[in-house]
Amino acid sequence: MWLLYLLVPAMFCRAGGSIPIPQKLFGEVTSPLFPKPYPNNFETTTVITVPTGYRVKLVFQQFDLEPSEGCFYDYVKISADKKSLGRFCGQLGSPLGNPPGKKEFMSQGNKMLLTFHTDFSNEENGTIMFYKGFLAYYQAVDLDECASQSKSGEEDPQPQCQHLCHNYVGGYFCSCLPGYELQKDRHSCQAECSSELYTEASGYISSLEYPRSYPPDLRCNYSIRVERGLTLHLKFLEPFEIDDHQQVHCPYDQLQIYANGKNIGEFCGKQRPPDLDTSSNAVDLLFFTDESGDSRGWNLRYTTEIIKCPQPKTLDEFTIIQNLQPQYQFRDYFIATCKQGYQLIEGNQVLHSFTAVCQDDGTWHRAMPRCKIKDCGQPRNLPNGAFRYTTTMGVNTYKARIQYYCHKPYYKMQTRAGSRESEQGVYTCTAQGIWKNEQKGEKIPRCLPVCGKPVNPVEQRQRIIGGQKAKMGNFPWQVFTNIHGRGGGALLGDRWILTAAHTLYPKEHEAQTNASLDVFLGHTNVEELMKLGNHPIRRVSVHPDYRQDESHNFEGDIALLELENSVTLGPNLLPICLPDNETFYDLGLMGYVSGFGVMEEKIAHDLRFVRLPVANPQACETWLRGKNRMDVFSQNMFCAGHPSLKQDACQGDSGGVFAVRDPNTDRWVATGIVSWGIGCSRGYGFYTKVLNYVDWIKKEMEEED
């Protein structure tokens, strides 16, 4: 609390001037020497100041001055804002004077003057009186400039706000009506509507001062920008009034409307424009006025609606729109598929799926595709077979059917147990665009070689030595080899050669792995065989029991040659079958041995054959011992022929097979392989018993299938 004293000169002589009080928000003012009697013949003015934006409020707490008529002798005078607020003296209850009591004195500005005046004495009827003086408190009170500026009677009023005034404790500020801009003086306003932006989904827009007359010289731009996918609708309200001319369209003032940068209307006059569907989320309203006019302007309400896309329509009867909706709007989508057996096509590209999305401009983001019938393409070629259409020839589309078949009688279709060849070969073009069989799926059938069925089986009974030439097709499995000299073999399947191991690794030679392997098939004449060409070998497999270094032991004399490429079977090239039971080795059973070996001590140029009986093993064993031979004759061998016969296999026939016709199946079986003997036409011949090696043969062949 500031205690402010009016200082008195030492001699209490009359004093003049003013005493400023430091600017504070509150304080007190007293007479000199208060509460002791104040001096005579004294006058001074106390200047009370509070911060700008506040008023001064003064209240006397104690007041005791010499009373007089009209407060002529001693008095306190209060003034503010260049006006007197009164002259006061006396005490509360005195018959003379004018005490202030508890009255509140208020300035309009931030200053108040308190003048204290005393005369030369304080006597009453010759008696000296003592008066205490006064004690007053002041405080800063908020000044409502906005209220005071409406009272323009002051000589120096505050600058007025042109439009709106806003008071706050200690000050005020000005603002402008919509469409106007506060100027640098912070009080005056100027019309400004060149860049008004509206982003709400709905609202009202009007000219300045609507419905009062709009200001002159306006260049207004009202922009409405809403979210993508919304379209704006404009509805003008009454009254609508823009200066016009009867003969010239909108020469003075005009309202122009643009949607997406395109002018969709220019309006003036008193006729309200029609409701506008802009089909856009961006609209600009340009309002221009000249320097004169007294029209009320315009007012509109804008609303938004989600933009809609046209109903999707298919291009053909095979396209399906899933869950078709009655209406599609922004961000909605539809999925198109095809009926079974058809596929989506966009341009020339095949689609696995199709989705179209409604865009913010009311269009679909991609065009409707079409559906094209699934095409399975050309059926795969069947090796050693072919196919025929059971539906329209050459048509490979959905539901087309083909029948695969094998080239008979040389091949037959591989079938599952209990199924027919006709079922195995039927393939249908499926809805997935793939040729399929009900049992095998996508995998095409397999044509297997037919074994042991020559189209021209042998009928003659002549023998190799003393016999005649074989005819084409008599022994279509016959193989001519030239490895370490002439040899033979038999075709198994369409890429395997069955032969004797000793033709690859002769007993009288050291083991060789780099010998040339020349193999010929498909003819009965050596020269013609050479013309047909050699068949490259992919792999050689010799039975592990074969021992090249044991000259008198032909145990395991069996080998397989895998051709690099499968051969194409025909009347002169067919495989022979493998045995499956012991009856093929019954005593006396007749078999045929064919070959390109020595004939009457001459090399044969044509294939020849001999018919021999299966001999008694004991007789063969006895015959061998009579020759003082130590050759091994095991259970994996059998013998054929007879010492009394002058026919036998000879050099160059090794590796060929002992072929027997199975009367039950009418198929030819390779029961033995020409292995060893003593000379030519000098007794029995010895053969590898193929039945004992069938498991090994099948295992070797299956490893490569």
Swiss-Prot record:
Q: Can you tell me which residues bind Ca(2+) 3?
A: D243, D253, D290, D294
How would you describe the post-translational modification of this protein?
Cleaved and activated by autocatalytic processing to generate Complement C1r subcomponent heavy and light chains that are connected by disulfide bonds. The iron and 2-oxoglutarate dependent 3-hydroxylation of aspartate and asparagine is (R) stereospecific within EGF domains.
Q: How does it assemble?
A: Core component of the complement C1 complex, a calcium-dependent complex composed of 1 molecule of the C1Q subcomplex, 2 molecules of C1R and 2 molecules of C1S. The C1Q subcomplex is composed 18 subunits: 3 chains of C1QA, C1QB, and C1QC trimerize to form 6 collagen-like triple helices connected to six globular ligand-recognition modules. Within the C1 complex, C1R is a dimer of identical chains, each of which is activated by cleavage into two chains, heavy and light, connected by disulfide bonds.
What's the EC number here?
A: 3.4.21.41
Listed under GO cellular component are: blood microparticle
State the protein's name.
Complement C1r subcomponent
Q: Which residues form the EGF-like domain?
A: 142-190
PROSITE patterns per UniProt: ASX_HYDROXYL, CUB, EGF_2, EGF_CA, SUSHI, TRYPSIN_DOM, TRYPSIN_SER
Q: Which residues form the Sushi domain?
A: 307-373, 374-449
Residues at which Ca(2+) 2 binds = D142, L143, E145, N167, Y168, G171
Protein's organism:
Pongo abelii (Sumatran orangutan)
Known activity regulation? Answer: Activated by the C1Q subcomplex of the C1 complex following C1Q binding to immunoglobulins (IgG or IgM) complexed with antigens to form antigen-antibody complexes on the surface of pathogens. Immunoglobulin-binding promotes autoactivation of C1R, which results in the cleavage of the Arg-Ile bond in the catalytic domain.
State the UniProt keywords alphabetically: Autocatalytic cleavage, Calcium, Complement pathway, Disulfide bond, EGF-like domain, Glycoprotein, Hydrolase, Hydroxylation, Immunity, Innate immunity, Metal-binding, Phosphoprotein, Protease, Repeat, Secreted, Serine protease, Signal, Sushi
Q: Which reaction does it catalyse?
A: Selective cleavage of Lys(or Arg)-|-Ile bond in complement subcomponent C1s to form the active form of C1s (EC 3.4.21.42)
GO molecular function term, any single one: calcium ion binding
Q: Enumerate the spans annotated as Peptidase S1 domain.
A: 464-702
What is the UniProt domain comment for this protein? The CUB domain 2 shows a compact folded structure in the presence of Ca(2+), whereas it has a flexible, disordered conformation in the absence of Ca(2+). Ca(2+) could provide a switch between the folded and disordered forms; low Ca(2+) could provide flexibility to promote autoprocessing and activation of CIR.
Reported function: Serine protease component of the complement C1 complex, a multiprotein complex that initiates the classical pathway of the complement system, a cascade of proteins that leads to phagocytosis and breakdown of pathogens and signaling that strengthens the adaptive immune system. C1R catalyzes the first enzymatic step in the classical complement pathway: it is activated by the C1Q subcomplex of the C1 complex, which associates with IgG or IgM immunoglobulins complexed with antigens to form antigen-antibody complexes on the surface of pathogens.
Q: Which cysteine pairs make disulfide bonds? A: C71-C89, C146-C165, C161-C174, C176-C189, C193-C220, C250-C268, C309-C358, C338-C371, C376-C429, C406-C447, C451-C577, C620-C639, C650-C680
Chain positions with (3R)-3-hydroxyasparagine modification? N167
Q: Which family does it belong to?
A: Belongs to the peptidase S1 family.
